[in-house]
Amino acid sequence: MVGIYRILASFVPLLGLLFAFHDDDMIDTVTIIKTVYETVTSTSTAPAPAATKSVSEKKLDDTKLTLQVIQTMVSCFSVGENPANMISCGLGVVILMFSLIIELINKLENDGINEPQRLYDLIKPKYVELPSNYVNEKIKTTFEPLDLYLGVNMNTSGSELNQNCLILKLGEKTALPFPGLAQQICYTKGASNEFTNYKLSDIQGNLNENSQGIANGVFQKISNIRKISGNFKSQLYQISEKITDENWDGSAVGFTAHGREKGPNKSQISVSFYRDN
């Protein structure tokens, strides 16, 4: 109970940030990571700038991330005795971690940071310690209760010269009910456009009707997620189902998706969740 009060208290300054934004600050449509979600905001006649982000778009990013964290917290604090609610909590956590690391990859790619050593030099142990152009100072308070840690898997990156591997982990002091949950994403260098343009293929999806209903309910509750392919939804749901199973031994669970382009340099992204205590 003390932990819950601590989290709620930490979100008090965030509410001021949220209410400070007005409808006219929002641009028409902003897609951060199309592979994961598409957010539709209030209508405006002003188009988004082509080359650089506007002040409104930066504010929108802050709002979206803040809302996603808060909604994940609410989902996990209202689990009760219903196993389906626990899966919903797990799915919210999986989506949040996946969204954060994909957005980080896109920013790194846009800045031309592709070499493992450069990644290693830039990545800080705690997510909130990243440079301000990666984690805005205004929303650092949002991430403090999550106790997020970052890392670069140099061994994996070294074995596959055309790939980088980043790790995002929930620390032991996280407010979420998954301390030690880690996510590793390995991705083809220079292929972030593959992640943002629905060009990934070879992802299997096989949710039954009941599971599909639970997944749809969770995605509808999380405002950041407007659109996601059925196959991605299936994979993320199956990961959440696994990590919330009390018999899970912590071994890796995940999937690999390939770009649609043919040839030896075909891009791919591999996602795995595991327990790292």
From Swiss-Prot:
The keyword Transmembrane helix applies. Keywords: Glycoprotein, Membrane, Transmembrane, Transmembrane helix. Residues 106-277 are extracellular. It is a multi-pass membrane protein. The keyword Transcription regulation does not apply. GO terms for cellular component: endoplasmic reticulum; membrane. It is found in: Membrane. The chain crosses the membrane at residues 1-21, 85-105. Residues 22-84 are cytoplasmic. Glycans are attached at residues 155, 265. This is Uncharacterized membrane protein YPR027C. It comes from Saccharomyces cerevisiae (strain ATCC 204508 / S288c).
